[in-house]
Amino acid sequence: MSEMRFRDEDFETFTVDGLDERMTVLKERVRPKLEALGEHFAPLLSSITGDEMFVHVAKHARRSVNPPNDTWVAFANSKRGYKKLPHFQIGLWKTHVFVWFALIYESPVKGEYGQLFEKELDTIQKKIPQDFVWSKDHMKPDVMRHSELDAEQLKTLFERVQTVKKAELLCGIQLPREEVVQMNNEEFLSKIEDAFRTVTYLYRFTQKQSV
């Protein structure tokens, strides 16, 4: 099995100055691991969701000035893209690795999914583990811990996805850099698999909704 766990030098990619310079290092150092993670987890996600999952590695092609502060591989049930669909992500900032179920702002039907989550609020609050986190913007590293959100705060998150055009909803885990570099490959992959098996619960809600 190829090495997929991120090392210190992978995280250090995001300290390289300049768009071209950082992208060169990212392509050489980080992208091969993202591609390997994609190949490893696409069959698992296909199996546990019942949808054939396709791999999409972030290319950052639209960037012309500012270098990326994070990068990722996404999994969605379409070859054509993932941003408009409920999807899964594995990626990293210079401080941590993230594993997400994601509804991001490009989704034309995220409002309908937000309504569905609001209806299932009590169940979701009980099912999501206390050490999981929520995000309302995939472009920022800030998160809200599930253990610190009461029902009203969670409801506000779900309502925001319905009413705010740029609103997003992501749920999953963050693994601190310091922990990741101490893991072996198997431990790292096991953490990701456990997270995916948990957030698939949210993905299944979107499968039930005909939108």
From Swiss-Prot:
SUPFAM superfamilies: YktB/PF0168-like (SSF142913). InterPro entries: UPF0637 (IPR009403), UPF0637_domain_sf (IPR053707). Pfam families: DUF1054 (PF06335). Belongs to the UPF0637 family. This is UPF0637 protein BPUM_1363. It comes from Bacillus pumilus (strain SAFR-032).
